[in-house]
């Protein structure tokens, strides 16, 4: 009870022992404002659960320098759980072919279909197995600021090198609310802001990015609006990664982008590295454009999921609502692989045309 008294609370028992008062005193008690003798809310009660130990933390500049970041696919077992063996093979292949970072649980990795327990576990697994060889950037963004805070705290506690944050979608907010949302997570560690209005239905305008860029933890922007926006930022010294694979060559070499956060690099990581590192290469870009068009004919990650299954590096298991591309498109993919060269693609099996019956669609997992 002594602890309760410190917060200005009165027990029911003690209330029974108040002396009987006259009518005026009773009236005053009913209408008086209750004032706590000690503030009930400790001022720093909601500080983030962050460690003050910085010796193993990634410097924001280490994130800003990355040119090829793969939005890594999450493969599944037939019962819908993560296939960690296949996942590890995918990440190892990225490392061997020169990718410098992976986005864990992004749109491509289907973070939107994961529980937060699954999501944070996969970030921790990736850090534990590969954190010394590749930068691990966890997609800990959410349209709920509360969830974004909690997930980002846990992700950095797991050892991720950076966070990817999207603006609040569906329940859209004001410009001021958008800025406030990002400010709550920026102080936790290196952060990439993700602008993809095609999915969120709300653009992050330059005025927000310019304000956020004053925070030293803002590593840069994954920008999907287009190259004019990319150049608007790079001219002011803001680091930008193209979020559009079909524009990333020109973004890099004509508009100042640092690199790309790529879906296509799940399939051809070596060629995507070449596209970002070895100077302007219009011939290679033209060679890859048909593959990129094929990948995004339906919303991502449908195309990459289908392709990795046909290449034999991931089981043909889809978490609904995603379903594979139709048979005619699967036949097209086999032709694309042969035109580009099987040796450039991940895995070592022959590319196959899978039948509809080969795919497993999971609704409960």
From Swiss-Prot:
The UniProt record gives the binding positions of pyruvate as 108, 261
What SMART domains is this protein classified in?
DHDPS
* Entry's EC annotation: 4.3.3.7
User: What's one GO BP annotation on this UniProt entry?
Assistant: diaminopimelate biosynthetic process
Taxonomic superkingdom: Eukaryota
List the active site.
194, 222
Give the enzyme's main class according to its UniProt record, as a single word. lyase
Query: What keywords would UniProt list here?
Result: Allosteric enzyme, Amino-acid biosynthesis, Chloroplast, Diaminopimelate biosynthesis, Lyase, Lysine biosynthesis, Plastid, Schiff base, Transit peptide
Q: Name one Pfam family in it.
A: DHDPS
Which Gene Ontology cellular component terms are annotated? chloroplast
Function, please?
Catalyzes the condensation of (S)-aspartate-beta-semialdehyde [(S)-ASA] and pyruvate to 4-hydroxy-tetrahydrodipicolinate (HTPA).
Q: What is the name attached to this protein's record?
A: 4-hydroxy-tetrahydrodipicolinate synthase 1, chloroplastic
What species was this sequence derived from?
Answer: Arabidopsis thaliana (Mouse-ear cress)
Which lineage do the record's taxonomy fields give for this organism? Eukaryota, Viridiplantae, Streptophyta, Embryophyta, Tracheophyta
């Amino acid at each position: 009870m002594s602890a309760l008294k410190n917060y200005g609370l009165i027990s029911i028992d003690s209330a029974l022992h108040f002396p009987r008062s006259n009518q005026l005193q009773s009236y005053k008690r009913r209408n008086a404002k209750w004032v706590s003798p000690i503030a009930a809310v400790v001022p720093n009660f909601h500080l983030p659960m962050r460690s003050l130990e910085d010796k193993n933390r990634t410097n924001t500049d280490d994130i800003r320098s990355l040119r090829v970041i793969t939005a890594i696919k999450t493969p599944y077992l037939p019962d819908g759980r993560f296939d960690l063996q296949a996942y590890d093979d995918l990440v190892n292949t990225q490392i061997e072919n020169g990718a410098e970072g992976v986005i864990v649980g992004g749109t491509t990795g289907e973070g939107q279909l994961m529980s937060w327990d699954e999501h944070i576990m996969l970030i921790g697994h990736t850090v534990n197995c590969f954190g010394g060889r590749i930068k691990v950037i966890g997609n800990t963004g959410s349209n709920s600021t509360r969830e974004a805070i909690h997930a980002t705290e846990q992700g950095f506690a797991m050892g991720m090198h950076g966070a990817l944050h999207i603006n609040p979608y569906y329940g859209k907010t004001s410009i001021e609310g958008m800025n406030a949302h990002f400010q709550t997570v920026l102080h936790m560690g290196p952060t990439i802001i993700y602008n993809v209005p095609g999915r969120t239905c709300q653009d992050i305008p330059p005025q927000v990015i310019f304000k956020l860029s004053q925070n030293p933890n803002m590593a840069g922007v994954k920008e999907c609006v287009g190259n004019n926006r990319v150049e608007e930022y790079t001219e002011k010294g803001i680091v930008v990664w193209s979020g559009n694979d079909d524009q990333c060559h020109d973004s890099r070499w004509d508009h100042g982008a640092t690199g790309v956060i790529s879906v296509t690099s799940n399939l051809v990581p070596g060629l995507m590295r070449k596209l970002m590192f070895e100077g302007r290469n219009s011939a290679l870009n033209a060679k890859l454009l048909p593959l990129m068009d094929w990948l995004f004919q339906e919303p991502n990650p449908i195309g990459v999921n289908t392709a990795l299954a046909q290449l034999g590096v991931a089981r043909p298991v889809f978490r609904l609502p995603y379903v594979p591309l139709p048979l005619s498109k699967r036949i097209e993919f086999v032709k694309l692989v042969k035109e580009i060269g099987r040796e450039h693609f991940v895995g070592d099996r022959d590319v196959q045309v899978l039948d509809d019956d080969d795919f497993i669609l999971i609704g409960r997992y």
